[in-house]
Amino acid sequence: MPRRVTLTDRQKDALLRLPTSQTDLLKHYTLSDEDLGHIRLRRRAHNRFGFALQLCVLRYPGRVLAPGELIPAEVIEFIGAQLGLGADDLVDYAAREETRHEHLAELRGLYGFRTFSGRGASELKEWLFREAEMAVSNEDIARRFVAECRRTRTVLPATSTIERLCAAALVDAERRIETRIASRLPMSIREQLLALLEETADDRVTRFVWLRQFEPGSNSSSANRLLDRLEYLQRIDLPEDLLAGVPAHRVTRLRRQGERYYADGMRDLPEDRRLAILAVCVSEWQAMLADAVVETHDRIVGRLYRASERICHAKVADEAGVVRDTLKSFAEIGGALVDAQDDGQPLGDVIASGSGWDGLKTLVAMATRLTATMADDPLNHVLDGYHRFRRYAPRMLRLLDLRAAPVALPLLEAVTALRTGLNDAAMTSFLRPSSKWHRHLRAQRAGDARLWEIAVLFHLRDAFRSGDVWLTRSRRYGDLKHALVPAQSIAEGGRLAVPLRPEEWLADRQARLDMRLRELGRAARAGTIPGGSIENGVLHIEKLEAAAPTGAEDLVLDLYKQIPPTRITEAFTHLRTGAPCADRIGLMNVILAEGINLGLRKMADATNTHTFWELIRIGRWHVEGEAYDRALAMVVEAQAALPMARFWGMGTSASSDGQFFVATEQGEAMNLVNAKYGNTPGLKAYSHVSDQYAPFATQVIPATASEAPYILDGLLMNDAGRHIREQFTDTGGFTDHVFAACAILGYRFAPRIRDLPSKRLYAFNPSAAPAHLRALIGGKVNQAMIERNWPDILRIAATIAAGTVAPSQILRKLASYPRQNELATALREVGRVERTLFMIDWILDAELQRRAQIGLNKGEAHHALKRAISFHRRGEIRDRSAEGQHYRIAGMNLLAAIIIFWNTMKLGEVVANQKRDGKLLSPDLLAHVSPLGWEHINLTGEYRWPKP
């Protein structure tokens, strides 16, 4: 028997409930003149009302009213208003059951509604079985089926029938896909795949498990471990059309299942399923391993360059005393010479009476040496890391299938020469004419190509970052052009906030920019800039003072005293079946273990319900990144619907910031050292927090990564982010590229720029700018470049909006482009225009500054809550894999969201109780009450759950 699709009560309600919002009522329940004509043929008011109601419900949600069903007041009011009837007129409808059936029969005849039976049902079943391959979840296939029933005017069958049909369709689709993949495998490849479950690697684990144990590293040993696996997989020559016609989400699901099965579990699967999972894993792991190799190479290059920088800095630090003494000696000699010149004494006598000419020569030689030390270049020391590259680079270049854009073809030729061993230090056409590498390469001995090899590998790293060089099969380092939205699809998408013609955008921005510059000039002359001034071409901005009303702090403390302890509930779905987890308490233990940074083994000791292996099983099959995202979205949506949340905002603005977490070992997963946070390796959780305090998005990024490219990820990769219109961030989160992308996509980007006075404005006509502002103008906007590249700019923005590629991936590549890349430069020009408009708004609008400050304060307070939640293991993230780190951060963020939801709900109840008691609280005071408190929550101890 096929498994049944188990829809949750929430999912069933979403499919079958009657609409209640004004928008949905207008869309689905507006009656036409024809409808009103049929309705008016009923003589009695209650029959007219009931006939109209049944018509509307048959159209949407597409079902029959159940006997005695309670109709929402909004529906009664909306339909009654169109008929001139009231709620009382519906009371007597269908006193006779026959009346309701007669009306249903008449509606089927008038409008062509049909029951789910006969040929129509067979056609729908055939359609459903074809459509099932594209469904991404149980809820998705049910939604597709319901939508098709509505389109064909087929009355929805019972919920149990829908679940049974969808279950059968999903099982059939799964088996068809598995059979399709397995049938494309030659016998020799089948034998190689099945051998993965029998062979062992390192006499410890099966080859199958060994192959999936990989993470990017930061040294040559890590690179070689990755290359061992990649080389092994490349010997399995899978057919090129293996996955043709298989939806991407089906491929991803098969891979994820393969990453959770052990060899014993795989052997127990049906043969087609086993082969399909093995083949998909081999195909996907090849691309993932290639990406991991490139990432590891990137880290090795970065570590070598930083080590070379440290050598330079150490030399300067070691010579600090000598520099002071040398400068002091020159100052003394110079002073004596100046005095002698003034007194008319021979200068030679002054030198002779001092340290003498020999002493002066020694001093000059010392100064020359110190000058060389102070000007030391890290490239002088990169040759010390040559041995690192020799351990893995030849294999890497042999195994990676590289392609290049025309601008990087000279580099690809140099890579080919390096791969084949024909090292020719004269091949330097891949270097820019102004590159410092030329000077260092000329200084090498004849026949010594080691530095040239390092130069090639350094530039290969940069080319991967910018996308000028790519891999033929890759997730992160593929050809970006293949992912960009076609130019002809931009107009159809309608998701961009700018005109399609560059002339229109330029004319609008020039008019706005000229007007705002004049306004700023007038304010500067009149001295009316809020909290600031422009004096002698220098901008001065004072820090805003706190604006919390009197009594806000006391109110917060008073309200929190009345909140009861917190309990946490949530549910995830099974990776393969899509069914909710039946063991809800076990699942809550797993989520809690991740969120408080305790780990499953210690959670098993701290709970009274589950063993470690039970928690492991639940975690492997029910906990994944997408499940955390779905759960977070549910909590955020529920919190936004609470009345108390409206005192803090409307969910249309947000702030984002990175939070550093210490990790245990450097070079594993995303663990890197960022000098800003000391010498301890770690990672950053980059989170978005709405004006209602909801942490609606979070992702793990390397500690050394710039935060700016990740701003749009949180806004575009989930529904809550798409409601945001104004985005705040701190200084580290802005670049001109981000300004441009946000403006094109319709977001107002408002970063708090710490060094704002040092930033320059840009104008279309700098000479026409007000005189007070000309010292602030940094240059002229290049209109011609924007016009030439406008179609490609729109393609990039449309691709970001479509979600086919993560915005951060595109923005990182643009930021890594060489200076001569015109597209990156054109997008920067657009960003300069938008940044100039924003800076003028910021200078003239104190309220904007205050909103940004409030938004960023909410984000920083949210960091404190997460820090309190993750108190176990001293707050260190000790997971060794990127996936484990992501789950740890996602669990932490989910717990924070649940606490915020609970606090919001209970604070609302407290406020409502005080209102009933006659104590009215000012909305201005309530706006300063935060749901981020945790003092009333007992986070540690023994976790005892009631027996189910």
Label each residue range with its predicted role:
Residues 775, 781-948:
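Long, compositionally biased intrinsically disordered regions
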Residues 526, 533-606:
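Structured, charged N-terminal subsegments at the starts of enzyme catalytic cores
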Residues 32-40, 572-573, 580-586, 636:
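Short linear interaction motifs
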Residues 2-4, 8-20, 25, 557-578, ...:
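Eukaryotic alpha-helical scaffold "rod" segments
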Residues 89, 605-646, 673-791:
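Catalytic or ion-translocation cores adjacent to nucleophile or general acid/base/metal-coordination motifs
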Residues 2-551:
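Long amphipathic alpha-helical coiled-coil/heptad-repeat bundle
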Residues 62, 603, 654-660, 727-732:
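Short, conserved catalytic/metal-binding motifs centered on acidic residues
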Residues 637-672:
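Structured nucleic-acid-interacting core domains from mobile-element enzymes and related host factors
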